[in-house]
């Protein structure tokens, strides 16, 4: 019992750092942007109304939608949009058109994650460093350079991994939540009447009096739920109970106290609207607060960067992006990975955002479209999971998700008003990633169709070969093939040029499935072909780490004995040539060919020993 309590405490502390780091830093800019937009007349009544809307937004979207409803839709203990997409896809697998539509929606939602991933670190770190302007206006010119230095250092250390410093994320973020709550308490004590804004009638009254203004300011109010989707995305790391406990015991109370403290300050000092968070603090605490805020925003950004690596790996395994160079940064934790291309592409996009928008207020205009559309997509997928996966009655499904759908739609509609002010930026990034994903997926389909059309039946081929068998050499040859039952090009090249066949031959096809994990008991499907040849299907979930030698070691005891020192892996390296009249526009064919050319080899992705790999090239027209 004592051990389970300490384990729960450790997981809860970890969740505070990783799950709630992003939403915890929203206090830096949310209230400032609502009143700084110029749409809300600065009156005590409006302060009450805005605070009430902020509180009930947190309650509705985070507490009710994500913590209560969405966390229930786990995929074998895993969360995130890809896990939800896999659940929804499986739930409607007998409805191919609906399944295709949901896959398209889900992939688009996943691509929007990268758009959000550019804005969030930029606005978080920039808003923290902007606290220096409150210390002294002379620091204003240093804000952009300091922000870029902090961001560069953050991305530069990624290749070393975060397993060492990761253990401090929870404690530091807990100190942050304690600090922001402590900032708010004196101001609430000075104006306890501000707690009246907890009543929803202030929010409803504001909406009733100013429906147009209410709709417009939702584009700024959404800043208070930045990172809400992390609750679901990190489900597999921490579990439901620690995430819920961390929210209701630490994050939600601290955020509420700080927001209401800012509201109390604005009632007493309306001029504090230019930066109410930092102006709550006494002068002596400003520099330490800027340092603490910068640390908190770096931790929040780190969680997002780690998430980008994880999502990219999952998308690659589902076949929507080409293989990239993936490095493991921890021997003990296989989930700790580093993808150089994603790291520096994200860094350059964030630098572009900081240089283009130059302030957290300008970046606030860019924030919202991608994340609210993601939230909307999550609600849609949740409906199909509980309707077709859990088989709940239609009326109950509509009741459970309909309200959240309308709330998400209102926030998305409001953020569309910011499209020209900056909302186009994350939407553009998401659209580019979506185009790349769909081009790769369609290109692979065309490539596989071409391979199937030209394929030679493996059984018939082996029967013909064994009529007049070539020289057999010691050892095992592993031939990778995209289609089971087809002769791999590498085998044809090997017989043509070397005129030998190994003593044991495995024809291996790797399949990735729309489930997070596939256990070792279901890893292999083996079919004997005769003549010491086997057809092997290797199955992985999108969160499994592909390790082909490790998987093939399970062949022992099935009539095939593999020795690592005498096993060679034969891979076909296809050179794709675009042709006129295929299933894609010419520019997409050329793009696919370039992506295929730049893709990392299968050897590294499948963890093959480099000194045992033989690559043989072939040219394919699509």
Curated annotation (Swiss-Prot):
Cited Pfam families: K_trans, K_trans_C
Keyword Transmembrane helix: yes
A Gene Ontology cellular-component term: plasma membrane
Cytoplasm as UniProt keyword: no
Sequence intervals crossing the membrane: 8-28, 50-70, 103-123, 137-157, 169-189, 215-235, 247-267, 285-305, 337-357, 366-386, 393-413, 419-439
Cellular compartments annotated: Cell inner membrane
Record-linked InterPro entries: K+_transporter, K_trans_C, K_trans_N, Kup
Catalytic activity: K(+)(in) + H(+)(in) = K(+)(out) + H(+)(out)
Membrane topology category: Multi-pass membrane protein
Keywords of this entry: Cell inner membrane, Cell membrane, Ion transport, Membrane, Potassium, Potassium transport, Symport, Transmembrane, Transmembrane helix, Transport
GO terms assigned for molecular function: potassium ion transmembrane transporter activity; symporter activity
Family: Belongs to the HAK/KUP transporter (TC 2.A.72) family.
Task performed by this protein: Transport of potassium into the cell. Likely operates as a K(+):H(+) symporter.
Name the UniProt record assigns to this protein: Probable potassium transport system protein Kup
Organism: Paracidovorax citrulli (strain AAC00-1) (Acidovorax citrulli)
Lineage, opening ranks: Bacteria, Pseudomonadati, Pseudomonadota, Betaproteobacteria, Burkholderiales
């Amino acid at each position: 019992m004592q051990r389970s309590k300490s384990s729960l405490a450790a997981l809860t502390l970890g969740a505070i750092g990783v799950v709630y780091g992003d939403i915890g830093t929203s206090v830096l800019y949310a209230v400032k942007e609502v009143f700084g937009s110029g749409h809300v007349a600065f009156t005590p009544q409006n302060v009450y109304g805005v605070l009430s809307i902020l509180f009930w937004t947190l309650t509705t979207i985070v507490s009710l939608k994500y913590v209560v409803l969405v966390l229930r839709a786990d995929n074998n203990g895993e969360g995130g949009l890809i896990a939800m997409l896999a659940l929804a896809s499986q739930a409607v697998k007998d409805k191919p058109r609906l399944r295709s539509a949901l896959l398209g929606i889900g992939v688009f939602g996943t691509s929007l994650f990268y758009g959000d991933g550019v804005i969030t670190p930029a606005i978080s770190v920039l808003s923290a460093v902007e606290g220096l302007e409150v210390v002294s206006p002379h620091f204003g010119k240093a804000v952009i350079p300091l922000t870029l230095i902090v961001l560069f250092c953050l991305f530069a250390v990624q290749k070393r991994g975060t397993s060492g410093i990761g253990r401090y994320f929870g404690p530091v973020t807990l100190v942050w939540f304690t600090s922001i709550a402590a900032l708010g308490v004196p101001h609430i004590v000075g104006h306890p009447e501000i707690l009246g804004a907890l009543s929803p009638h202030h929010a409803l009254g504001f909406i009733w009096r100013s429906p147009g203004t209410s709709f417009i300011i939702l584009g700024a109010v959404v800043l208070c739920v930045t990172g809400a989707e992390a609750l679901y995305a990190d489900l597999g790391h921490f579990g439901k109970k620690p995430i819920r406990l961390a929210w209701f015991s630490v994050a939600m109370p601290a955020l509420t106290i700080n927001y209401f403290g800012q509201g109390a300050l604005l009632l007493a000092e309306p001029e504090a609207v230019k930066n109410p968070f930092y102006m709550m603090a006494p002068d002596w605490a400003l520099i330490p607060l800027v340092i603490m805020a910068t640390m908190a925003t770096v931790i929040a950004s780190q969680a997002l960067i780690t998430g980008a690596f994880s999502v990219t790996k999952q998308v690659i395994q589902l076949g929507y992006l080409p293989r990239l160079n993936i490095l493991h940064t921890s021997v003990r934790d296989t989930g700790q990975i580093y993808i150089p291309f994603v790291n520096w592409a994200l860094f350059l996009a964030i630098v572009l955002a900081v240089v283009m928008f130059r302030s957290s207020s300008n970046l606030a205009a860019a924030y919202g479209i991608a994340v609210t559309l993601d939230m909307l997509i999550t609600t849609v997928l949740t409906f199909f999971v509980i309707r077709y996966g859990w088989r709940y009655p239609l009326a109950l499904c509509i009741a459970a998700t309909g309200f959240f759908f309308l709330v998400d739609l209102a926030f998305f509609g409001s953020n569309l008003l910011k499209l020209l002010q900056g909302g186009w930026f994350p939407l553009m990034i998401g659209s580019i990633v979506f185009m790349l994903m769909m081009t790769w997926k369609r290109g692979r389909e065309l490539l596989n169709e071409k391979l199937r059309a030209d394929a030679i039946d493996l059984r018939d081929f082996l029967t013909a070969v064994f009529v007049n068998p070539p020289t057999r050499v010691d050892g095992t040859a592993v031939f990778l093939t995209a289609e089971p039952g087809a002769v791999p090009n590498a085998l044809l090249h090997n017989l043509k040029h070397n005129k030998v066949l190994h003593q044991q031959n495995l024809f291996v096809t790797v399949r990735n499935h729309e489930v997070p994990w596939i256990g070792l008991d279901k890893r292999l499907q083996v079919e004997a072909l005769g003549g010491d040849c086997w057809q092997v299907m290797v199955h992985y979930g999108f969160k499994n780490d592909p390790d082909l030698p490790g998987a093939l070691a399970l062949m022992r005891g099935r009539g095939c004995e593999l020795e690592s020192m005498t096993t060679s892996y034969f891979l076909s390296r296809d050179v794709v040539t675009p042709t006129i009249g295929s299933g894609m526009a010419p520019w997409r064919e050329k793009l696919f060919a370039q992506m295929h050319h730049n893709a990392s080899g299968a050897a590294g992705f499948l963890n093959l020993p480099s000194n045992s790999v033989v690559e043989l090239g072939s040219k394919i027209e699509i």
